[in-house]
């Protein structure tokens, strides 16, 4: 299975069967992500060196204007798309099997978790996993320690303030709390 076939399968919404081809690809990609993130997190890198490592990790071209302060963690890496002028602060964790898209100008604060995987609520089926993409719009600011769950879209210009985001966020809106609730609209 190629990386593109993996991405296409994950976008299809079909289940991942334990021991199947996609599940085995998970393991392969996880091992590669562990190796690359250990390199990213293990020592200082110039911005140019870090950029090269991010392209290896994400398996695609990364805009030169993307910035990151390590450490950074991911358990897949190959299903993240990042736009121009995105900044990812220290301590972030991306669980990107379901797909993460971060549009241009977005700011991702310290210790943010983006989780595209869910487990079944029924204890008898809890080992099963479902996947849904996360989409972060243009010029979004996700503040420190926020968590964004599978299937969420955060609209352009929104601000997420220390929240657990379980539902879509409208553009130009500030949300906060657990679970995230609208605080106010942003006048633009």
Q: For each of these PLM feature ranges, what is it?
A:
Residues 1-65, 180-184:
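Terminal amphipathic alpha-helical/low-complexity segments used for targeting or macromolecular assembly
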Residues 72-153, 178-188:
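Flexible, glycine/small-residue-enriched loop-and-beta-strand segment within the central core
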Residues 144, 161-164:
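Active-site-proximal glycine-rich helix-loop-beta segment
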Residues 160, 177:
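Conserved G/P- and acidic residue-centered "switch" motifs that form tight phosphate/ATP-binding loops
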Residues 172-173:
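Extracellular disulfide-bonded cysteine-rich modules/repeats
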